[in-house]
């Protein structure tokens, strides 16, 4: 494709590319295609390489946009690709490298061209470009074939039917990337696309029966986490006799461009993490998230979302009364293992959220696991490093915890799992702590971080809801976890007093004043009192349901008993304070009777004895604290920009000009 090219700048002068985009039609049978497609490359793996590639070929692509209505060369290139893919499965089985090599190169060029098309012309115009043939200017033959649907269908077939081998890795990655590129029109629209011709092609017609197989294959690509084969290890190995036809063809026709791109160190050097990651697994996961978040309508539900919602475990032999046509079976054990291992990435956390929220089969399976710590610990680590994470990742991690805490079995079992030496928790050395106590510590830390930095009410609400769901099942709380619960209450009470003082001063200052309105301290006070009420309910729930299991909680409560005095007569808290007040009074009296200067051990002993003697009927019953996560209306307004921001930032070898992106701001997330 570029025998004489030596730099990226010269791409725009490359004779083969100029001919493809020029004013002359090229027949599908011409030797030109063999020359065009005979180059060696590794697909660009970072956006820096892709940016250089796009800038180098932009003028070529624009020429093709201008000339294609007359030449039909885009359609010719696509037909050449389609013809090369017809024997692809057999080629993979027979290790026929030449066929796979040329099919990959054709798809790579198509992908590069269409990526520029999507930023330059509308969806409707793009589809029109697929219909142009080499006839009179502007003529097209819409009836003879639907080349666009043919391409989509071919890409899906390729992904689901070609086995994943070293030999086929690059073309499978390119096929997944091509589908992402075809769907990327959403990036260039501020509003969510509800009517998209490309979406309709994917969700109807020939592509529809392949929905479940595509979703299953993308999930398995994520599960397998296959590393990219070493560059050159699977493409045209030189024979001992000096190289066969294939090697000679590759090296002879294709010196230049792609070696500059990939071996010459163009662009930024990848980090060790990038080098070790699986491009195909990452790209497959991104495509799966894009597909499952496409908008649907009552008359045309999103089949990809249905597939994600209804798939089952391979060991599940039950028969659904109303089976979904897009359901399938997959190994849940393998899926669970990969989900546990991959939580450092936003997209893996978003997949976990999606499956827990939408697929009841996955949720039931996860909650029944005996090694829940393998999933929960990575989620807690995300929250612990809240300063380093984007807000969306933190939200997803938090909502996952909220969904898990809706289950009483989960809330009980996490206190039975004992962990040793949590190295990433640096506030205090935790030589031994239950998973439940660690979860409480991390959630409280998230609340405190939010109070001092972001002040996001939504974050507060979800943190407190998770603690509330757990509170009746608190068991053997670690002394530090109990202290942090009371410390958080102390922080809230100080904040309450400060806002109350500001509100009082504001009221005095505003009397007789006609100046601009002052801050709404009444609203601030209302918010802080809601949070305090919630914390009191959490403490009360623990005391009324599991006091005898939590001597450390009673100890922490007694140690800071003066904190609660100001709320005893407060109209917003009087009812909930009755139980807390009674517990404080009961145990304070027992400690007085036990004598002065008691050691910590002796105090805990008195508390344990008192817990048995405490008359439970004197504690007022309150409704059980139960909060359930519910997606807000029009969730696509949040999830579609989020998914595409992940594609933009994490897509392998994908670059879009930030000035063209309308869907989200560059600092969002």
From Swiss-Prot:
GO cellular component: Golgi apparatus
Subcellular location, record wording: Cytoplasm; Golgi apparatus
Presence of the UniProt keyword Membrane in the record: no
Domain of life according to the entry: Eukaryota
Keywords in alphabetical order: Cytoplasm, Golgi apparatus, Lipoprotein, Myristate
Main location: cytoplasm
Stretches that traverse the bilayer: none
Pfam families: Dymeclin (PF09742)
PTM section of the record: Myristoylated in vitro; myristoylation is not essential for protein targeting to Golgi compartment.
Lipid moiety-binding region (N-myristoyl glycine): 2
Alphabetical GO biological process terms: Golgi organization
Keyword Protease in record: no
Physiological role: Necessary for correct organization of Golgi apparatus.
Family: Belongs to the dymeclin family.
Protein name, entry field: Dymeclin
Gene expressing this chain: dym
């Amino acid at each position: 494709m570029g025998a004489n090219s030596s730099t990226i700048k010269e791409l725009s002068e490359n004779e083969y590319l100029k001919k493809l985009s020029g004013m002359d039609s090229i027949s599908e049978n011409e030797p030109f295609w063999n020359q065009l497609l005979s180059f060696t490359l590794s697909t660009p793996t970072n956006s820096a390489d892709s940016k250089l590639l796009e800038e180098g070929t932009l003028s070529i692509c624009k020429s093709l946009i201008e000339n294609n209505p007359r030449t039909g060369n885009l359609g010719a290139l696509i037909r050449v690709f389609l013809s090369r893919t017809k024997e692809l499965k057999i080629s993979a089985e027979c290790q026929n490298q030449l066929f796979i090599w040329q099919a990959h190169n054709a798809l790579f060029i198509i992908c590069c061209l269409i990526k520029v098309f999507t930023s330059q012309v509308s969806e409707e115009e793009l589809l029109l470009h697929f219909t142009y043939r080499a006839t009179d200017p502007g003529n097209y033959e819409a009836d003879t074939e639907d080349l666009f649907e043919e391409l989509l269908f071919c890409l899906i077939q390729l992904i689901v039917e070609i086995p994943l081998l070293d030999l086929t890795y690059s073309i499978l990655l390119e096929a997944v990337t091509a589908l992402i590129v075809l769907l990327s029109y959403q990036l260039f629209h501020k509003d969510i696309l509800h009517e998209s011709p490309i979406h309709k092609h994917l969700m109807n017609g020939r592509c529809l029966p392949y929905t479940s197989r595509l979703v299953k294959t993308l999930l398995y690509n994520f599960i397998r986490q296959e590393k990219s084969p070493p560059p050159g290890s699977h493409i045209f190995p030189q024979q001992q006799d000096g190289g066969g036809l294939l090697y000679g063809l590759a090296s002879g026709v294709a010196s230049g461009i792609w070696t500059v791109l990939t071996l010459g160190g163009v662009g930024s050097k990848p980090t060790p993490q990038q080098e070790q990651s699986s491009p195909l697994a990452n790209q497959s996961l991104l495509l799966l998230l894009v597909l499952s978040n496409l908008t649907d309508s009552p008359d045309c539900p999103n089949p990809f979302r249905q597939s994600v919602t209804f798939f089952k475990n391979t060991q599940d032999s039950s028969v659904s009364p109303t089976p979904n046509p897009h359901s399938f079976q997959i190994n849940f054990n393998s899926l669970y293992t990969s989900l546990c291992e991959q939580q450092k990435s936003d997209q893996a956390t978003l997949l976990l959220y999606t499956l827990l929220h939408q697929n009841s089969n996955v949720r039931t399976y996860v909650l029944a696991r005996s090694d829940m710590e393998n999933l929960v610990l990575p989620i807690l680590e995300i929250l612990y490093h809240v300063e380093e994470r984007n807000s969306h990742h933190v939200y997803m991690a938090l909502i996952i915890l909220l969904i898990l805490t809706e289950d009483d079995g989960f809330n009980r079992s996490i206190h039975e799992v004992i962990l040793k030496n949590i190295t990433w928790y640096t506030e205090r050395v935790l030589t031994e702590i239950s998973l439940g106590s660690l979860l409480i510590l991390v959630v409280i830390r998230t609340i405190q971080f939010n109070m001092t930095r972001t002040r996001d009410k939504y974050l507060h609400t979800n943190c407190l809801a998770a603690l509330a769901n757990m509170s009746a099942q608190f068991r053997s709380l670690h002394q530090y976890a109990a202290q942090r619960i009371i410390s958080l209450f102390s922080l809230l009470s100080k904040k309450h007093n400060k806002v109350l003082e500001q509100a009082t001063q504001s009221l005095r200052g505003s009397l007789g004043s006609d100046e601009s309105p002052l801050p709404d301290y009444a609203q601030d006070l209302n918010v802080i009192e809601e949070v305090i009420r919630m914390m009191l309910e959490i403490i009360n729930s623990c005391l009324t349901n599991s006091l005898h299991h939590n001597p450390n909680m009673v100890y922490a409560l007694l140690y800071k008993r003066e904190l609660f005095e100001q709320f005893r007569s407060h109209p917003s808290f009087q009812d909930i304070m009755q139980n807390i007040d009674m517990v404080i009074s009961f145990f304070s009296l027992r400690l007085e009777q036990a004598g002065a200067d008691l050691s910590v051990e002796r105090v805990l002993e008195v508390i344990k004895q008192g817990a048995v003697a405490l008359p439970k009927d004197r504690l007022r019953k309150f409704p059980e604290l139960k909060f359930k996560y519910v997606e807000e209306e029009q969730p696509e307004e949040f999830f579609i920009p989020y998914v595409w921001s992940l594609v933009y930032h994490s897509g392998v070898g994908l670059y879009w000009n930030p000035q063209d992106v309308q869907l989200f701001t560059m600092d969002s997330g």
